[in-house]
Amino acid sequence: LFGELNKVSLREIWPHEASDFTPWLAENIGELGKALGMDLELTEQEASVGDFSLDILAKDLGSSKSVIIENQLTQTNHDHLGKLLTYAAGFNASIVIWVSEAIREEHRQALDWLNQRTDTETSFFGVVVEVIKIDDSKPAFNFKLAASPNEWQKQKNRQTPRGSVSTKGEKYKNYFQSLIDDLRNNHKFTSAKAGQPQNWYSFSSGSSGITYGANFSQEGKARAELYIGLSDREKNKYIFDELEKIKEEIESSLGEEISWERLDNGIASRLALYTDGSIDDSDSELESVKAWHIEKLLKLKSTLGSKIKPLFNVAKSM
């Protein structure tokens, strides 16, 4: 009736950590993000820290926090724990992730201790990656969370009032928590799970540096956008200009006009949609804004999703 479930050695799939596993993990960073409840975006592979190289430098799009990922194809060891802390300090990381085949109990305890002793802005995660097969099936991978922050304990240890969130910040956090929960549970739009006390939230497009965003601007407007924010100005303007060449096609598909914001005085560019809305609106008005944000984000993704990747690939080679 049932097949036999078998674990596969990681080295059968990825013989070499640096040349096989790290590139695969970088390419599948979104899957790791799902296991952690984050939208992770790759920043750099083999990022230099003095004479050493971090496996993966990334960003949590929901909070813009820096993320470091150190991985190994074997059980955790003291050498990699030392590297993990060195890289965390070198990049001033807020989110520290250790991926391995197995996590020794003393190393899990070390991660728990670090989570208990650090502030609410710093989080340490231990993640086990496993590969499984059923009989002679194709191998499948799975990420299992082995160590993570105890948010209740971190909240308890938070210093007040210096560490407290403003009333408006709490409103933003509650709004975006509701928004991302809806987008995740009902539309599979994001893996994010934690709202932030800020007036914006970004979501992965699948191309590093290009994101979908939901925002509240200072002019009493709510905005849904495609944000083109690579580190290179020329590449951003190229992507924007190429999209603008098919403006009529894009706007016809969306069913409305877009605000085309090249932002010539800045590095980034964006395509935006606006409606009236403020975080200080009534609960019923904010529900309407949330419904608008969801509708427009889904439309932007369905209209622009297939167009972004080819332009991103060309821009990368420029």
Regions found by a protein language model. Name each.
Residues 1-318:
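Charged, terminal alpha-helix-loop-beta segments
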